[in-house]
């Protein structure tokens, strides 16, 4: 509901967009304020059982813009309508101190960070992949679950985990991915890669290949070059 109301307020920017002379700004305005966009962002159209499938708290699903279940449900609606690239952000994982309680990030929350974050993410991802499969669009939709770096395997002096780029995992589903396999392995503590290290370049090449693009081909756009 908040998303729909926010989009309705974009009407105040109509004159600015039309008088700017910026074609990209005008196009972005038309896209955001279109009836198709408004319909896509209206999660109230979804049956209650679908919202419950995505969220640990279906009531919060329509109110909290940071709710991972709501975001994944919205992602599915956008994909259904032909949006080619959708990003879902799940925040709250940067816990450098006191992992035993989540209250340092959310006052009043007595759960540990893992108990506060993992169940919702787990349910949302499972719901998204299952829902895409039920609608026969998983095979044409690549789902990528990743972060920019991992966390230190050892707890630091303040009871948290710091940034750790040496070893972490990425999950992929749909889009032609052969499921049911794990590529590479870490040592016993999860500190370093023990077998088949995968680089960012390897990951990018896999994504390009699944999208039907040749990762070895260099492409240059001259559209904005003078």
Which residue stretches match the model-derived regions?
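Ligand-binding pockets and gating/stacking loops
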Residues: 1-225
């Amino acid at each position: 509901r908040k998303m729909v109301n926010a989009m309705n307020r974009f009407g105040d920017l109509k004159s600015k967009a039309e008088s700017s002379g910026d074609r990209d700004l005008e196009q972005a305005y038309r896209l955001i304020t279109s009836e198709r966009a408004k319909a896509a962002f209206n999660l109230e159209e979804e049956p209650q059982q679908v919202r419950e499938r995505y969220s640990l708290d279906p009531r919060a699903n329509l109110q909290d813009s940071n709710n991972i279940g709501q975001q994944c449900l919205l992602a599915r609606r956008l994909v259904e309508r032909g949006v080619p690239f959708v990003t879902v952000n799940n925040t709250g994982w940067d816990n450098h101190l006191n992992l035993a309680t989540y209250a340092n990030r959310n006052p009043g929350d007595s759960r540990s960070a893992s108990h506060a974050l993992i169940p919702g993410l787990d349910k949302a991802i499972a719901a998204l992949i299952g829902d895409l499969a039920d609608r026969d669009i998983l095979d044409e939709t690549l789902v990528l679950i990743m972060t920019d770096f991992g966390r230190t395997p050892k707890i630091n002096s303040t009871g948290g985990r710091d940034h750790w780029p040496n070893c972490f995992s990425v999950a992929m589903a749909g889009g032609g991915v052969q499921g049911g396999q794990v590529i590479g392995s870490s040592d016993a503590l999860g500190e370093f890669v023990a077998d088949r290290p995968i680089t960012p370049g390897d990951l990018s090449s896999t994504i390009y290949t699944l999208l039907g693009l040749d990762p070895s081909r260099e492409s240059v756009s001259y559209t904005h070059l003078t």
